[in-house]
């Protein structure tokens, strides 16, 4: 990454919503949330983003995800670290990567969320546990609107029963993904 591109990765500007971590443009009906996250399920308590998904950051994510630019993993992990530390709030959570459908993982050769979770783990010593599995494939959410994303993501994830014995039920879980837009994937994972 050149210095110019790095300088153009835009942090999420304040004021931040304390729940979804995005710029709070329109207040929500309840204190502590904005109009974007007020409909999230209670199981998804908070979220955070490393940066705005615009300009070079959006190009990097697309290259990482769709062109196999996995050499960006550490750069992206560095950018995600402050947001992850804010969410952890002094605790050591278990990092849970969002799983890909089998066909998509086979096609890409990697799961970008797993790579990012492992990059965060190298920086924090927090454990990574693949607690979720993708129940079914489906269309990519990248070009879908809010309602379509919610419909596709609903019931798409479940707990992987083989992973459960390794986890204390009182553990804090931090779901890791490359992008958060509407929160549909994060909500579906938290509900699993």
Q: Where do the protein language model's features map onto the residues?
A:
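Glycine-rich phosphate/pyrophosphate-handling loop used in enzymes and phosphotransfer proteins
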Residues: 1-192
């Amino acid at each position: 990454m050149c210095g110019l591109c790095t300088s153009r990765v835009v942090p999420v500007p304040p004021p931040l919503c304390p729940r979804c971590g995005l710029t709070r443009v329109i207040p929500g009906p309840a204190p502590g949330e904005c109009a974007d996250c007020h409909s999230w399920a209670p199981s998804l308590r908070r979220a955070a983003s490393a940066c705005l998904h615009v300009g070079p950051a959006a190009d990097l994510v697309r290259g990482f995800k769709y062109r196999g630019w996995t050499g960006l993993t550490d750069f992206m992990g560095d950018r995600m670290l402050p947001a992850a530390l804010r969410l952890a709030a002094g605790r050591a959570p278990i990092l849970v990567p969002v799983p890909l459908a089998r066909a998509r993982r086979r096609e890409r050769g990697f799961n970008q969320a797993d790579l990012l979770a492992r990059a965060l783990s190298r920086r924090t010593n927090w454990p990574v546990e693949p607690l979720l599995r993708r129940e079914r494939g489906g269309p990519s959410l990248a070009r879908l609107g809010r309602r379509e994303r919610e419909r596709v993501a609903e019931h798409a994830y479940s707990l992987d029963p083989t992973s459960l014995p390794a986890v204390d039920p009182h553990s804090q879980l931090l779901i890791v993904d490359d992008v958060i837009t509407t929160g549909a994937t994060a909500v579906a994972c938290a509900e699993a």
